Amino acid sequence: MFGVARDQHAWVALDGTRYDAIGTDRKLYVVEEGLAYDITPIRETQALTNPFTTNATTSVVVTDTSHGAQKGDFVTFDSFSAIDGLDMNKEFEITSVANSDAYVVTTTSAASGSTSGGGGSGNAKYQISIGPELSTSAIVTGKQQML
């Protein structure tokens, strides 16, 4: 599991299956009989064409106009062609945001070459943005509020 747990809710289904929902600052999980499943909601899906730029390193620049992502968010790519030996059809954490139209993800191995605008056509599924790792509460005008 990614992140710092923020809340938890346990229940038992009518068939006796035990569930536990755990929300972290980064993801939302459901634990069923000891197995954790990532059920973090998707905030947006974008159809992209040739969005990847490689430079023979593990950093891949992704171009997506008005992506709305921030550092630490998660994106899942699907239906793209391999680019410079990299399979981009999986989930990545966004490691930096260049601007409102581009961000960087880091792969586990280096690209075998340098390509500007590759990968063919596919989808980018953006999960809801992450929250702060640290938070505190305070009494403000008689009401408890998260800061």
Predicted segments, located by residue:
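N-terminal beta-propeller domains
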Residues: 1-45, 128
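Small/polar beta-strand repeat architecture
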Residues: 39-146
